[in-house]
Design a protein with these regions (language model features):
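S-adenosyl-L-methionine-dependent nucleic acid methyltransferase catalytic domains
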Residues: 1-103, 107-111, 118-122, 126, ...
Length: 242
């Protein structure tokens, strides 16, 4: 995967899991709880291969000394660090996101936090622009499940903090897992230039629509068929008043 230009900051969303039998992928109606995530159900060997590819791409386009924030459950504490090291990324510490409202799970204790692996590209002194009293516990209210557009949607505030701590206005930010587009919205709010990738075409559409609604602007398609134009045409055909 080729990602350019080089980035001052990288934000990558980790994987999440839910029972495969509950996944009901649909083309017209997109509900995060019904749509499976790409690469969500893979073997340990395949997951290791994917980690090397993902972290390798982050390191390849990240400037030396610049940071990456990688979300992932605590179970990844044994998986991420060795691959980060192999990719030339220094694993500094974890940041704990306290969601303020617990998440119902099948475990004995409800989940109320998520881990972020804070790392930077080796080869230069790392850049940190946050205050001296910044802590590794971020209390940020989670997105209301009724308004979520992606199964692992993160609050925009999380991306805003990462950008303010590790990048300057006008610099580039890369998100290899675009998902709901929270990173793009955070970049708009903080004056950064965001570059997003998303494997699922439907979530690409979600990101574009969310950006258009937030900015009031119209996204321009660089190449290929316009899914929104085709969708509007289908709606016109279904509307007998047109």
């Amino acid at each position: 995967v080729r990602v350019e230009p080089r980035s001052n900051n990288a934000i990558a969303a980790g994987l999440s899991s839910f029972p495969a039998e509950e996944a009901q992928a649909g083309r017209r109606k997109l509900r995060p709880r019904d749509r499976p995530l790409e690469n969500d159900f893979v073997s340990d060997e395949e997951f290791g291969r994917l980690l090397h590819a993902w972290f390798g791409n982050i390191a390849r386009v990240l400037l030396p000394g610049r940071a990456a924030y990688i979300w992932g459950g605590y179970a990844n504490i044994a998986n991420y660090p060795p691959v980060l090291k192999a990719a030339g990324l220094y694993f500094s510490q974890t940041i704990i996101w306290v969601k303020e409202h617990p998440v119902l799970t099948r475990k004995d204790f409800m989940g109320n936090h998520e881990w972020c692996f804070y790392t930077w590209r080796e080869g230069a002194a790392h850049v940190f622009l946050g205050p001296n009293n910044a802590t590794d516990v971020w209390s940020v209210k989670k997105v209301n499940p009724q308004s979520m557009v992606h199964l692992t949607e993160k609050p925009v505030e999380l991306a805003v903090r990462a950008m303010q701590y590790s990048s300057r206005p006008g610099e580039n930010v890369l998100d290899l897992f675009g998902g709901s587009g929270s990173t793009l919205i955070a970049a708009e709010q903080t004056g950064r230039r965001a570059f997003l990738m998303e494997l699922d075409p439907l979530y690409c559409d979600v990101i574009v629509r969310r950006w258009e609604q937030f900015t009031g602007q119209k996204a321009e398609l660089a190449s290929g068929p316009d899914p929104f134009r085709e969708e509007d045409a289908d709606d016109d055909e279904d509307n007998p008043d047109n």
